[in-house]
């Protein structure tokens, strides 16, 4: 999926400014995302792809021996962020139809669990969970366990009963929704991901990120992409 022609034009127009550092706080992009989703800018985090946000979350949240619960198979980076920090990857097999086993995931949460990740739609199987099922799942978890819902492929779901989880995120103090411009907007090579999160989480991510983690052209492209 290529980017919109208007995005290409915006990037080319901005190319003469690549000798200047990017906005380290990504204020314009974060404001554009906040406006899109009806949130405050303080609830928006951006990174050099969603991978970057997951790595930052690992740096901010995980210590040696902490547990992270997620499905198996799912996005391979989840296991990697655990391994690099000495955290324990608690991998719950998918059900026979390749759906998340949410009951087993909830049962796997212990006092050592810091993070639960739900990839929805799941990568690589493509199965998705209705928002109501995710809400019921979150209700079973302690509020001190952070839940990240990875919606990297949300733009590709055509089912009538599909609902994203941004409404759920607004209602729960321990839920983040992570997304990317790589898939639906065709910007994989520029690396832009974003999270809609409680401000405690965005503040924690900001403390551990590099100051210029999203380059100038990527910010221009993402802002323009949101207009289409």
Which sequence ranges carry the predicted segments?
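Short acidic capping loops at alpha-helix termini that bridge into adjacent secondary structure
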Residues: 40-44, 64-67, 112, 144, ...
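Short hydrophobic alpha-helical segments of the AMP-binding
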Residues: 33, 81-82, 141
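PLP-dependent aminotransferase-like
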Residues: 60-118, 132
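PLP-dependent aminotransferase class I/II
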Residues: 4, 10, 25, 174-228
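Active-site pre-lysine segment of PLP-dependent enzymes
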Residues: 102-111, 124-147, 151-187, 200
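N-terminal small-domain helix-loop-helix segment of the aminotransferase-like
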Residues: 1-51, 56
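Short glycine-rich anion-binding loops that position phosphate/pyrophosphate groups of nucleotides
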Residues: 1, 50-51, 75, 120-124, ...
């Amino acid at each position: 999926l290529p980017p919109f022609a208007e995005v290409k034009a915006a990037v080319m127009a901005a190319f003469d400014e690549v000798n200047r550092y990017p906005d380290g706080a990504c204020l314009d992009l974060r404001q554009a995302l906040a406006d899109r989703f009806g949130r405050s800018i303080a609830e928006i985090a951006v990174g050099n792809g969603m991978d970057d946000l997951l790595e930052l979350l690992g740096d901010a949240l995980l210590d040696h021996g902490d547990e992270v619960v997620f499905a198996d198979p799912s996005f391979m980076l989840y296991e990697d962020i655990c391994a690099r920090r000495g955290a324990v990857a608690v991998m719950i097999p998918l059900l026979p139809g390749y759906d998340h086993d949410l009951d087993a995931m909830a049962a796997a949460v212990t006092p050592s669990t810091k993070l639960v990740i739900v990839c929805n739609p799941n990568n690589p199987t493509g199965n998705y969970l209705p928002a109501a099922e995710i809400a019921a799942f979150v209700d079973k978890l302690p509020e001190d366990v952070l839940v990240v819902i990875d919606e990297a492929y949300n733009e590709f779901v055509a089912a009538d009963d599909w609902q994203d989880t941004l409404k759920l995120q607004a209602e729960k103090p321990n839920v983040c929704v992570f997304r990317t411009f790589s898939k639906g907007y065709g910007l994989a090579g520029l690396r832009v991901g974003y999270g809609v999160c409680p401000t405690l989480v965005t503040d924690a991510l900001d403390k551990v990120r590099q100051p210029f983690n999203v380059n100038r052209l990527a910010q221009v492209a993402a802002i323009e992409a949101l207009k289409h």
